[in-house]
Amino acid sequence: MGMRITHLGSGSRGNSTLLCSGGTRVLVDCGFSLRQMESRLHLVGVEPQSIDAILVTHHHSDHSRTAKRASEKWEATLHANLETATKMGWQPMSECRTFGGLDRIGISDDLSLLPIPVPHDDADNVAVIATNGDGRRAAIVTDLGESTVELNKHLIGCSHISIEANYDSKR
């Protein structure tokens, strides 16, 4: 079983990455308008209602803009760490499943996610290591200011590593 990684967009106007493994579909970040998200998913042949989960890496709007609305409309489970959920005003458990750093999230037998805290201008940013049912791993790292020993340790053995490192704290 393979894992498909599709970058739907990356930049200050929005970020989102689609992970597919077996029958499981997960969005890492949902930072575009709902119409743009649906359009981008359709462009890659994915029905928005087939999304199983949305994981938000941090609270900045270019990563989180429509995550809650999309999760409600598509009936996808919303995941964020407690700091992000609090900053977004999402109610843990009723509106959002919260996780701690390095708490593995089992989405299905086909896909699990491991959030890894990474430095950014706010303390709530996480990278994501996705593992499929065959044990293949992929890393999605956004807004990385600098790497950490913990992140480097988890990047070893990944068959795909995507790093967005265009963040500038002086801008």
Language-model-detected regions and their locations in the chain:
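Conserved beta-strand hairpin/beta-sheet module of binuclear metal-dependent hydrolase folds
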Residues: 1-44, 126-143, 160
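Structured catalytic core of nucleotide-sugar glycosyltransferases
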Residues: 6-17, 53-73, 85-89, 99-102, ...
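Metallo-beta-lactamase
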Residues: 80-135
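Active-site metal-binding motif and surrounding structural segment of the metallo-beta-lactamase
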Residues: 33-80, 159
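Cap/insert and terminal regions of metallo-dependent hydrolase folds
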Residues: 148-171
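Active-site metal-binding loops of divalent metal-dependent hydrolases
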Residues: 9-10, 30-32, 59, 118-121, ...
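Short internal beta-strands
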Residues: 76-84, 164-165
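Short amphipathic alpha-helix with an adjacent loop that forms part of the alpha/beta core around
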Residues: 41-45, 104-109, 151-154
